[in-house]
A protein has these predicted regions:
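Concave beta-strand-loop units of leucine-rich repeat
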Residues: 1-10, 17-30, 37-50, 57-69, ...
Length: 150
């Protein structure tokens, strides 16, 4: 179900059974607690989304540019997680089990030592990350435009 840029969409509580749901740029969406059963969920640029604690069961989750998102501790079970531009995110220690993780432009992220189990990790434009020595187990690592000590 694609509801891209549907500004009138506010209540998504009845959409928890949908397999693939695109709510990108639906700025009226705030409460996503009923969407934990969605397989593939795109909430990119949903400015009102803050609490993502119920989304740990989502397989593929796009939260890019959701600047209100701060606490991602419940998302360790997500397979593919996009946090591109989530500048409020600081603590990523619970995300070591994520298979593919994009933290590009997450300026608050400094400590990535718990992410050694991630298969594919993007840290592009993460100037706060200076030590990647614990990431030896990462298969694909993107450090473009990041000042790090390798």
């Amino acid at each position: 179900l694609n509801l891209y840029e549907c500004q009138g969409v506010v209540d998504v509580s009845a959409l928890g059974g949908v397999h693939t749901l695109k709510l990108s740029d639906c700025r009226g969406v705030v409460d996503v607690s009923a969407l934990g059963g969605v397989h593939t969920l795109d909430l990119s640029r949903c400015a009102g989304v803050v609490d993502v604690s119920a989304l740990g069961g989502v397989h593929t989750l796009n939260l890019s540019w959701c600047r209100g998102v701060v606490d991602v501790s419940a998302l360790g079970g997500v397979h593919t997680l996009n946090l591109f531009g989530c500048r409020g995110v600081v603590d990523v220690s619970a995300l070591g089990g994520v298979h593919t993780l994009d933290l590009s432009h997450c300026r608050g992220v400094v400590d990535v030592s718990a992410l050694g189990g991630v298969h594919t990790l993007r840290l592009s434009h993460c100037a706060g990350v200076v030590d990647v020595s614990a990431l030896g187990g990462v298969h694909t690592l993107d450090l473009s435009r990041a000042c790090v000590q390798v």
